[in-house]
Regions:
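Register position in tetratricopeptide repeats
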Residues: 402, 436-437, 470, 504, ...
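Polytopic membrane enzymes that build or remodel cell-surface glycoconjugates and lipids
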Residues: 1-432, 438, 454-459, 463, ...
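TPR/TPR-like (Sel1-like) alpha-helical repeat modules
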Residues: 564, 571-592
């Protein structure tokens, strides 16, 4: 029943496409490269160190390629596995109501973001291995008074390592493990000694994760004082608790909170959290003991995402649904235990309440999963609840610009820049729209603003260089394109544009390796293949140029320019019988496009 419910609830997302940074995981990532595993595991090329998660995506790329169904289906299966493991763990720990807790977790709307967003695979993997860690430790006697270093203990240590290699935010788990020992008995020196390796791994990976966050991104994420971060942490805890208890109006990008240092009110949530904790502590001898443990577990597992250290997503919002994926199980376990007590007292009422609650949560999750059917639907839903999300305006503008809806895209880019004038990528995106719509002067102004705001933004240098070349400023354009590639050597569009600039300046032989590198980085890059075919002919390699263009039209049969250029090269080679159909195909495609 549990797995069937998971499949039914999340099925609307299975047929969804890529959203937000999903594209980046595959378009410009080592996941597509044959040597990707080396870079994923043994280098600092990636912005974050989640090699187990990245390895699953690397393997799946070999199975599904750019088709999203397989990735979504894997996420769904992983979430079903999480729910089953949670049931098994809670039963092993002797918690009543374990199945109800697992059901609530399986269908809770807050989890939709982790399941439906491919890039959040890391949450699912980390949770899966974290639960395996607890289950194996329970088999090793963690809470039974005979905790020992047997094979189950070794498996638990391995599972925890894999959890950290999936996502380092699982690092607080050893504190929860110590709490589980404390729940059962007074921890002994042997208990502490056996848990010490878990704490060692947690500290090491926490430091590693902070290093990647600090070195993987150069922009300032949050310019907030230590006091502001502490006060903000109190707000974050209550926000997540509210969404766990009443999961309504869930969106991808929540409004960012102002934390004015001089306003005493920002400290009220933290004070309330401290007072609530103190009250639970004083009442711990009675029925509140379980509530104290759940509250402490919830807060401890939230520590990595409370804002004490920077996470790149916090540029846009301090909170996100997927951040509480690991923490929320403590609250749901408490709910399951409470339901079990109620069921023993009023079985019919408790059963009816469970059915209604699970049904309501499942309905909300099914509706929420439907928002992930495509990126446009997701961003429009975000803007309905958070109309001042400059990121949602920018991303929607990018989608509509790609679809040729230039006026609407421009309006969203302008709105994004009104909300955040210092958003360099937004200026660069608006510049691309101006350039593509035949307004080079406006495009140059936007690109120059972007470069001024963020000199290391390769996109802006690429756009500026390409527009300069198109407007006759060849040498200046070449310099900008080379700067883009200095900043981001694995940038296929910039390689292609540099090849075009070199070809335009008559350096045909120098253009060839640029096109070849663009195709190596992005094999499904028809413009680079077309340009390479033409350029090979210019360097006296006519036969190679024909072969290249034949490959382009085979892979992209609707590419009119490639058909036309193939016709030209076949004509030059004296192969008129083959050239004529190529010209006719190009003419037909261009006529159909009018």
């Amino acid at each position: 029943m549990l797995l069937a419910l998971v499949a039914a609830v999340y099925w609307p997302a299975v047929h969804g496409g890529f959203v937000w940074d999903d594209d980046a995981y595959f378009t410009y990532n080592r996941i597509k490269a044959p040597d990707g595993l080396y870079h994923i595991w043994l280098t600092t090329d990636c912005a974050d160190y989640w090699p187990v998660t990245s390895t699953t995506l690397w393997l799946e790329w070999r199975l599904w390629g750019g088709h999203t169904f397989g990735y979504h289906l894997t996420n769904l299966v992983l979430h079903g596995g999480e729910a089953l493991l949670l049931w098994a763990v809670l039963r092993r720990l002797g918690l009543r109501g374990a199945y109800v807790a697992a059901l609530l977790f399986a269908v809770h709307p807050v989890n939709v973001e982790s399941v439906a967003w491919i890039a959040e695979r890391k949450n699912l993997m980390a949770m899966l291995f974290a639960l395996l860690t607890v289950l194996a430790l329970a088999r090793a006697g963690l809470t039974a008074g005979r905790f020992q270093a047997n094979r189950w203990y070794g498996l638990s240590l391995l599972a925890f390592l894999l959890a950290l290699l999936s996502k380092a935010s699982v690092a607080p788990l050893p504190v929860v493990l110590l709490g589980l020992v404390g729940w059962a008995r007074r921890p002994s020196r042997r208990d502490l000694g056996l848990l010490l390796p878990f704490f060692g791994l947690a500290v090491a990976f926490a430091k590693l994760n902070v290093w990647f966050e600090e070195h993987g991104y150069v922009e300032v994420v949050r310019d907030v004082s230590p006091g502001g971060r502490l006060a903000g942490a109190g707000m974050v805890v209550w926000f997540y608790l509210s969404k766990a208890l009443l999961p309504l109006r869930l969106i991808m990008i929540y409004p960012n909170w102002a934390l004015p240092a001089g306003d005493f009110r920002i400290w009220l949530p933290l004070g309330a959290a401290a007072a609530f904790s103190a009250w639970l502590w004083r009442a711990r001898a009675g029925a509140a003991r379980g509530a104290l443990f759940a509250w402490a577990d919830f807060c401890v597992m939230l520590v990595p995402v409370l804002g004490f250290t920077d996470i790149y997503f916090m540029r846009y919002a301090l909170v996100a649904d997927h951040y509480q994926h690991l923490a929320m199980i403590a609250l749901l376990a408490l709910a399951g235990a409470g339901w079990a007590r109620w069921q023993a007292w009023r079985p019919r009422g408790a059963t009816a309440a469970a059915v209604v609650t699970v049904g309501a949560l499942a309905t909300l999750s099914w509706s929420q999963a439907g928002l992930y059917r495509d990126a446009e639907t997701l961003y429009l839903a975000t803007l309905r609840e958070n109309p001042d999300s400059w990121l949602a305006h920018n991303n929607l503008g990018m989608l509509w610009a790609r679809d040729g809806r230039v006026a609407e895209a421009t309006a969203h880019f302008r709105r994004a820049l009104q909300l955040n004038p210092n958003f360099a990528q937004g200026h660069s995106n608006l510049g691309v729209t101006f350039a593509d719509s035949g307004h080079p002067a406006e495009a140059l102004a936007e690109f120059r603003t972007a470069v001024q705001l963020e000199p290391i933004l390769a996109d802006a240098h690429n756009g500026l260089g390409n527009t300069l070349v198109e407007t006759g400023h060849l040498e200046e354009g070449l310099a900008e394109l080379r700067e883009a590639l200095r900043l981001q050597p694995d940038y296929p569009e910039a390689r292609n544009n540099l090849g075009n600039a070199l070809a335009k300046s008559g350096h045909w032989a120098a253009a060839v390796p640029q096109y070849e590198e663009a195709l190596r980085l992005r094999p499904d890059f028809p413009a680079a293949g077309n340009n390479l075919g033409v350029t090979l002919e210019k360097t006296g390699r006519l036969a190679e140029g024909i072969v290249r263009l034949q490959e382009v039209v085979r892979l992209h049969p609707a590419y009119a320019d490639a058909w036309f250029n193939l016709g030209l090269l076949l004509h030059e080679a004296g192969r008129e019988a083959e050239a004529r159909p190529a010209f006719l195909e190009a003419a037909q495609l261009r006529a159909d496009a009018r």
